[in-house]
């Protein structure tokens, strides 16, 4: 569980970008490459502590592997009108 505010902001930006890329037609290999690049940039710039980057990587990988994050919600049919 992420507790550092900067790390949480990075997680939110990252997961929003992953969902947006998925909706544009990118697949899991592309998402993984994006995640790897994002994490490499964080490590290179020392924006957050290395152990926080590792935690962020674990959480983001868990997010990618949960396919329910990328499913489009189906609207519920409205009943009772007929």
Please identify what each model-predicted range represents.
Residues 4, 54-82:
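Charged low-complexity stretches with an acidic bias
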């Amino acid at each position: 569980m992420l507790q550092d505010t900067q790390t949480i902001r990075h997680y939110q930006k990252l997961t929003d970008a992953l969902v947006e890329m998925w909706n544009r037609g990118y697949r899991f290999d592309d998402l993984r490459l994006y995640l790897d690049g994002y994490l490499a940039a964080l490590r290179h710039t020392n924006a957050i502590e290395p152990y926080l980057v590792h935690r962020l990587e674990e959480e983001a990988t868990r997010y990618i592997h949960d396919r329910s994050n990328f499913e489009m919600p189906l609207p519920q049919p409205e009943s009772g009108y007929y």
